[in-house]
From Swiss-Prot:
This is General transcription and DNA repair factor IIH subunit TFB5. InterPro entries: TFB5-like_sf (IPR035935), TFIIH_TTDA/Tfb5 (IPR009400). Belongs to the TFB5 family. It comes from Candida glabrata (strain ATCC 2001 / BCRC 20586 / JCM 3761 / NBRC 0622 / NRRL Y-65 / CBS 138). It is found in: Nucleus. Component of the general transcription and DNA repair factor IIH (TFIIH) core complex, which is involved in general and transcription-coupled nucleotide excision repair (NER) of damaged DNA and, when complexed to TFIIK, in RNA transcription by RNA polymerase II. In NER, TFIIH acts by opening DNA around the lesion to allow the excision of the damaged oligonucleotide and its replacement by a new DNA fragment. In transcription, TFIIH has an essential role in transcription initiation. The keyword Chloroplast does not apply. Its main location: nucleus. Disulfide bonds: none annotated. Signal peptide: none annotated. Pfam families: Tfb5.
Length: 73
């Protein structure tokens, strides 16, 4: 039987997909379907939340020398 679901198709590299899966593991309301290693079907109202969470996670992993200067002063 065929099911139709409204969603947004995301194409991303496997490392970003892993981060989105990690975000979804906490909430269980983001990913509708994992299609393959680079495609996800996600809930249409969660796209902005995914962007914000990815930016937050990725910014924690970026080295910024200016941060060290601020801590020294």
């Amino acid at each position: 039987m065929v099911r139709a679901r409204r969603g947004v198709l995301l194409k991303c590299d496997p490392s970003i997909k892993a981060l989105i899966v990690q975000i979804d593991s906490e909430r269980h309301d983001i990913i509708l379907e994992e299609l393959d290693e680079t495609h996800l079907l996600v809930h249409p109202t969660k796209v902005e939340f995914i962007k914000m969470e990815l930016n937050r996670l990725l910014s924690k992993n970026i080295y910024n020398p200016l941060d060290e200067e601020e801590e020294e002063h």
